[in-house]
Amino acid sequence: MKLSNQKTGHLLHSLDVSYGSGSGQQAVIGSTSQDSAESMWVVRSEGCKQGDAIEKNQLIRLQHARTGKWLHSHLFQSPLSGQQEVSCFGSSEQSDTGDVWEIEWDDGKKAAWMQDMAIRLKHKDTGRYLSNHGKMYPRPIAGNSEVFASSAKGKEQLFKATEGVYYSVNK
């Protein structure tokens, strides 16, 4: 699936480029390109089978579909805003608690995560929220915006699942 930020409209995106500072891990950015496979993510959760609903406050991991690395955060500073860096790290065989996110939403009537529903992803280790703003990178990833983790809970922290492969919910 693809995740779009509610404020910027940019897609959560990663490509095989490493940060030049901080962790040096694979960069995660906000992309304006709507048709790239680099914006595809697979949702994983402990004990969750294909077709199981993702419930409010459930712990999930997002795996980058092309590289197999996990959406990750840690205490390194992000390159543009100095907030908390978000990267891609590990592999299907290598994961740690820095890859775990808690899914939240404000609509109390919804029991399960649905397409086009505004959600927040809270990093389990640090309590910060996946975020995107309009600050754009220079070369080599010019035209893409910074993705980071923040303690704020505004529009920069709201994402929605847009296109992707969705399954009927298991009964």
Task: Label each PLM-derived region with a short phrase.
Residues M1-K171:
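Lectin-like carbohydrate-binding module/patch detector with strong preference for beta-trefoil
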